[in-house]
Swiss-Prot record:
Pfam families: CTU2. Keywords: Cytoplasm, tRNA processing. Its main location: cytoplasm. InterPro entries: CTU2 (IPR019407), Rossmann-like_a/b/a_fold (IPR014729). It comes from the Eukaryota. Plays a central role in 2-thiolation of mcm(5)S(2)U at tRNA wobble positions of tRNA(Lys), tRNA(Glu) and tRNA(Gln). May act by forming a heterodimer with NCS6/CTU1 that ligates sulfur from thiocarboxylated URM1 onto the uridine of tRNAs at wobble position. One of its GO terms (biological process) is protein urmylation. This is Cytoplasmic tRNA 2-thiolation protein 2. One of its GO terms (cellular component) is cytosol. It is found in: Cytoplasm. PANTHER family: CYTOPLASMIC TRNA 2-THIOLATION PROTEIN 2 (PTHR20882:SF14). It comes from Drosophila sechellia (Fruit fly). Pathway: tRNA modification; 5-methoxycarbonylmethyl-2-thiouridine-tRNA biosynthesis. Belongs to the CTU2/NCS2 family.
Length: 405
């Protein structure tokens, strides 16, 4: 089986739990001989727990992780139609560059798939100015012959345009923005926005007749995603939230995360080696400007970032734990109409306790009712066939008015 360098994730025990040095903010130029090819280089790349190597050897190592993730599981059929999601982050540019490199190799080494790129414009939803169109056009030219498309988050899939025809929409009447404003907590807004983004990407893939979608999540992102899913009550689907393959999307569209085995340091080094220019800084996601304690997602992200800085192997342990969780793949169980997660088939004591607490809170001055009546009402709510999972039902409960869908 193809190895992807698992020793670099600090899974070898207590020795890797020791803090050798903080992750570098950039590349330190240190000329010398490459430990791999023994060629003298003016710039060596020293990853944690690896010997220093030249630019060519580092790029070969990083690209091998990308190819090994897809090749080991054999989940990408030959000549598959692939949609790469570009969000302007460093990770998405690395994924774009790696896929383009794999597409331009000779026949023997070439990754045989037909790729398209879609840039999801999220700046209007976040209250920021849209990305410079010139930067997107430069990417389109640099990574020809990929077809580049642009769609705004919250817009209809039919509004998608090619990059050469795109101009930012001047219509301020965005239904998604209005719905986000109706949600009381930032936690619910971020969760709802994430699900809407995933559903939009699925619809775009169907419009372009793509069977597979590439997302640029790396190991630290997936560790954060795993803990966040559990905190939000999405534990039943947490395995698919961090897996290489997520098959919950409608229309038989499969979501792949081929960068799942890369870490932040490798992304930084790759960006420098290829002289890539991210469109946005890391951490510019929706709601991050409100601080670490403003939502469960922000708090979890800050917690994992602190672990990554001081105890990098712990993040690897969290991420690897997610790999070992078995996904619930019972085809007979219904799925949530919003997030496509498997619905709970039985009423658990935990869900009943949560719903009972919500019922008591909403009863207010009507607490003269007997405990039996309140418990019965809580059970009735759980048995309500609204097609929503527990986490999506919590978002629905926060809406001041209207329906989640």
């Amino acid at each position: 089986m193809c190895s992807i360098g698992e020793d670099d994730f600090g899974d070898d025990g207590a020795t890797h739990a020791m803090v050798v040095e903080s992750l570098p903010l950039g590349i330190v130029l240190s000329p010398g001989n490459c430990s791999k090819c023994d060629v003298n280089s003016g710039e060596l790349y020293k990853l944690n727990f690896r010997t220093a190597e030249c630019r060519e050897c580092f790029l070969a190592y990083a690209r091998h992780k990308f190819r090994a993730a897809l090749g080991a599981a054999k989940i990408l059929p030959r000549n598959a139609e692939v949609l790469l999601v570009l969000d302007g982050s460093a990770e998405s540019l690395v994924l774009l560059d790696m896929l383009h490199f794999a597409q331009t190799q000779n026949t023997f080494k070439r990754l045989h798939c037909n790729a398209r790129v879609v840039y999801v414009e999220e700046q209007k939803v976040q209250g920021r100015d849209p990305v410079h169109l010139e930067a997107l056009q430069n990417l389109s030219t640099q990574y020809a012959p990929f077809d580049f498309y642009v769609i705004e988050l919250g817009a209809l899939p039919s509004s998608m345009q090619r990059i050469k025809d795109y101009s930012p929409s001047l219509n301020a009447n965005n239904e998604l923005i209005h719905k986000l404003q109706k949600l009381r907590s930032l936690t619910a807004r971020q969760d709802y926005l994430q699900q809407q983004r995933k559903n939009l990407i699925c619809s775009v893939a169907q419009c372009l007749q793509c069977t597979h979608v590439f997302e640029s999540n790396i190991s630290v992102d997936l560790a954060t995603q795993l803990l966040t899913a559990i905190a939000l009550g999405r534990g039943g689907s947490a395995a698919l939230d961090v897996a290489l393959l997520d098959d919950r999307l409608s229309g038989d569209v499969k979501l792949l995360r081929p960068l799942k085995d890369l870490n932040e340091q490798e992304i930084q080094f790759y960006i420098h080696a290829q002289r890539l220019k991210p469109l946005f800084e890391k951490g510019s996601c929706f709601g991050r400007e409100h601080g670490q304690t403003a939502s469960l997602q922000n708090l979890t992200s800050a917690f994992v970032a602190n672990l990554q800085q001081n105890y990098a192997s712990t993040v690897s342990t969290v991420f690897r734990t997610g790999d070992k969780i078995a996904a619930n793949s019972n085809p007979e169980q219904s799925s949530c109409v919003h997030c496509r997660s498997t619905l709970d088939s039985e009423i658990s004591d935990t869900l009943l306790a949560i719903e009972y607490s919500r019922t008591v809170s909403e009863a207010g001055v009507s607490l003269y009712k007997s405990g039996q009546d309140l418990e019965g009402l809580a059970k009735k709510r759980l048995e309500n066939k609204d097609g929503l999972c527990h986490a999506c039902r919590a978002i629905q409960a926060e809406l001041d008015s209207g329906n989640l869908l």
